[in-house]
Amino acid sequence: ESSAASDVYKRQSLLDRLSGSDEWTTDLSKLKELRKYADDPAVLKELREIKAANKQDFARWIEQRQGSVIDPDSVYDTQIKRLHEYKRQLMNALYIIDLYFRIKEDGETDVPKRTFIFGAKAAPGYTMAKGIIKLINAIGELVNNDPVVSKYLHVVFVENYNVSPAEQIIPATDVSEQISTAGKEASGTSNMKFMMNGALTPVSY
């Protein structure tokens, strides 16, 4: 059994066990059963262990796939969506640049170690979207090779993003960036997948 398949089994068995069945997969009201475990030390410990294992799996996977070496103990801050201006990957990229200069020029060190994970494809004729992908990769080159900033930040653009990489990324994510322009997202569902895998969700409103 593959590591990924094993992790899926662990996550599902935890949710099934806590909610009393697998009915939550078709009836989300069953998730109310989880509320009583919000402060349960044993449950939180198990959840942290599952998340840590998934993060280690992703770190191994991304290194084998495209040579990116990341710290599994860092915060995995993820934005995986079709590349579009309204989805605001550019805003996220500019935030990384801001962090870079705060560390590099201002000497800020009170920064949690963070790995920014992007996954996206651009429509063939969408020049702006392709430019944003190029910018994110350029920021990654700058950040990842800086002897000072790379101690705190790392940027990964997952190549050839599709469903298969998502199966590796989503279980490992700590922070799920859902920052599309308010009112523009017709029917986003990836946020739910992240939530069911224990990710925190900053959102636009």
Question: What does each of the following model-derived ranges do?
Answer:
Residues K10-A38, E46-K51, K55:
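Terminal amphipathic helices with adjacent charged low-complexity linkers/tails
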